[in-house]
């Protein structure tokens, strides 16, 4: 299920951003803007993988199946967030952070505290490193009215936010370690 969910999310990100990627020198050679994969074929890839994700989730257990539309909403929604919020990095963290809860639900069919704590840890960790990754596109984002923490707060502000997110991550690791 995880592979199909990731394929869906990655495919949708490339599909949704194809016109943005075509304008950015760093991403212009990605497969869709470069014409190696058609937008239509990318859309089919997304649809097939989303259906396979839902089918696999149903095979795992009923709760996983019931929550699969929510997971897909978060995974696909991330790709649109840079169009309206600088906090898109947090949404990416949430998209990846739901994996520990999803894995635990797949194995046990129930919720527990530890996977929720791990989700929080992954959210701050991924958000922190995505802010660093986004530094390379800060100027492009500003010029094209795209939202990101580096575009909104500048390089120094973004690094400060990334440091804070990483400090929270270290604290979460210590908290989880002392809890278990």
Predicted regions, residues:
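Amphipathic, non-transmembrane alpha-helical scaffold segments
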Residues: 1, 91, 95, 121, ...
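Multi-pass membrane catalytic core of lipid/isoprenoid biosynthesis enzymes
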Residues: 1-3, 18-68, 143-180
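Transmembrane alpha-helical segments that form the membrane-embedded catalytic/substrate-channel core
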Residues: 3-11, 73-80, 98-101, 120-136
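Residue-level signature of catalytic and energy-coupling elements of molecular machines
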Residues: 17, 88, 137
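Intramembrane alpha-helical segments
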Residues: 30-118
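Aromatic-anchored, glycine/proline-accented short structural segments
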Residues: 104, 110-166
């Amino acid at each position: 299920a995880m592979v199909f969910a990731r394929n869906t999310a990655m495919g949708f990100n490339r599909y949704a951003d194809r016109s943005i990627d075509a304008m950015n020198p760093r991403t212009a050679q990605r497969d869709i803007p470069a014409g190696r994969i058609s937008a239509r074929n990318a859309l089919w890839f997304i649809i097939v993988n989303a259906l396979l994700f839902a089918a696999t989730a149903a095979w795992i257990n009923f709760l996983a199946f019931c929550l699969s539309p929510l997971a897909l909403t978060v995974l696909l929604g991330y790709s649109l967030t840079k169009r309206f919020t600088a906090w898109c990095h947090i949404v990416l963290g949430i998209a990846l952070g739901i994996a520990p809860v999803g894995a635990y639900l797949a194995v046990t069919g129930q919720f527990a505290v530890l996977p929720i704590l791990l989700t929080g840890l992954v959210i701050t960790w991924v958000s922190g490193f995505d802010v660093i990754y986004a530094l390379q596109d800060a100027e492009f984002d500003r010029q094209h009215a795209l939202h990101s923490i580096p575009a909104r707060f500048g390089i120094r502000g973004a690094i400060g936010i990334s440091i804070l997110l990483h400090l929270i991550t270290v604290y979460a690791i210590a908290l989880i370690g002392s809890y278990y």
